[in-house]
Amino acid sequence: MGALRWLFWVGLSYLSCCRLPRAEAQFPRVCMTVEAIRSKRCCPALGPDPGNVCGVLQGRGWCQGVQVDTQPWSGPYTLRNVDDRERWPLKFFNQSCWCTGNFAGYNCGDCKFGWTGPDCSVRKPPVVRKNIHSLTVEEREQFLDVLDRAKTTIHPDYVIATQHWMSLLGPSGEEPQIANCSIYNYFVWLHYYSVRDTLLGPGRPFTAIDFSHQGPAFVTWHRYHLLLLERDLQRLMGNESFALPYWDFATGRNTCDVCTDQLFGAPRPDDPGLISLNSRFSRWQIVCNSLDDYNRLVTLCNGSDEGLLQRRPRDSGEQLPTAEDVRRCLSRHEFDSPPFFRNSSFSFRNALEGFNKPEGALNSPMLNLHNLAHSFLNGTRVLPHAAANDPIFVVLHSFTDAIFDEWMKRFHPPDNAWPEELAPIGHNRLYNMVPFFPPVTNDQLFQTAEQLGYTYAIDLPGSLEESQAWAAMVGSTIGGALIALAVLVLLLVLFQHRKQRKGFEPLMNVRFSSKKYMEEA
């Protein structure tokens, strides 16, 4: 079953089928108590005073009922009140902190992305995400080192649930079924939880559900996912100016230029499916990979190690996307189109995700852009529930987000460009993205990167229309120049011809007499 998940992604198996919180989220550790779980109330105090709930004494926020999207959804998930991610997060909590102004976080103790200061009123200079190949040696090592540290550092604020909501308090009803998790493994767990199957019983998964792919939320969900990791890494380093780099995978090549020991690890000579022992990533264990086992046991990924990271870039002639693919994708004016799913045509989102051809036409058996890059790298990354285990996931999605940001800046879409209803479950504009907590909607991330505190040092190709207009202008210029040259040549020919005719005329107009020299006149 797990091996078929990627085929489900690419459409080959159609039968299956703004208040920004603090760091990553399943649920804050402070809220995973028996009392909080039973009351469904996650409104922690800010600081030592228990009365300072949500920072209310400083005017930072207050505790209130969670707002959820009530609009109908479409798509293959037709069940109701079966999955604990429906109307997220009401199965777990129905009250949380609502933060005022630029305050944010599960207890309103932080600032929104892009803001700083004691009252969160100062705009931070945006951090700049750079091409990973343009980083200095120091910047590169800093990034790789902090990733490695995040793999082994327990997340300071959040824990993961190891059981579904009905079993969250354990057999006795007194023991929360939770586990600590490292910062990076938490990043992996969030992605897994957003794509995991709905369970109808032991070994009876309903696979036609995905909260982070195959719909409009693909771009906003992964954007927020990266922002959370970026902030966690900044805090781990003590460097608020740190920014995630990106990997420009639109090279058109059949080689992986980040699969080197200087970056994410070359193939291991004696087993090309594993990472070279010269790379720090050769030691990385994956988590959340055993989807079939979780389904059979009716449980969730608990963050346990499940084997070494694998990667085997394809050598069968398959090529990565090209810059022309990016250009064509950026030429799509419409953000998304009905049915807002993997079979949407002439949709920027679907072209970027990779179910459409870059020019917008639907071509289900084919992979493009984001999907093609995943498929090309092969190994652990091919399965969506486990894909984030490979650190290349971070830089691949950073580039995908850069394309999304470029599109936002070029077209300035209105809010209603995003469907309010009848997108697949989790993908309506005001749906709370699963499994982030406190709740954050798709709409809150549907803005330019600069508004969220970061930018990209990137020069993406112009749109197809711009290219065609440029080609037309160049063509008309060249055409005009050729016409002018032809006229000039014609004038020169006429001038030369005239000169030649004048050359055969007598220099003096002389009349000759028929009389001989000696005769009298």
From Swiss-Prot:
Gene Ontology biological process: developmental pigmentation; melanin biosynthetic process from tyrosine; positive regulation of neuroblast proliferation; ventricular zone neuroblast division
Involved pathway(s): Pigment biosynthesis; melanin biosynthesis
Glycosylation-annotated residues: 94, 180, 239, 302, 343, 378
Catalytic activity reported: L-dopachrome = 5,6-dihydroxyindole-2-carboxylate
Cofactors that this protein relies on: Zn(2+)
Matching Pfam families: Tyrosinase
Keywords on record: Glycoprotein, Isomerase, Melanin biosynthesis, Membrane, Metal-binding, Signal, Transmembrane, Transmembrane helix, Zinc
Positions with a binding annotation for Zn(2+) A: 191, 213, 222
Annotated GO MF terms: dopachrome isomerase activity; metal ion binding; oxidoreductase activity
Lumenal, melanosome side: 26-474
Topological domains annotated Cytoplasmic: 496-521
Compartments (UniProt record): Melanosome membrane; Melanosome
Gene Ontology, cellular component aspect: melanosome; melanosome membrane
Function text: Plays a role in melanin biosynthesis. Catalyzes the conversion of L-dopachrome into 5,6-dihydroxyindole-2-carboxylic acid (DHICA).
Protein name as annotated: L-dopachrome tautomerase
Source species: Gallus gallus (Chicken)
Gene encoding the protein: DCT
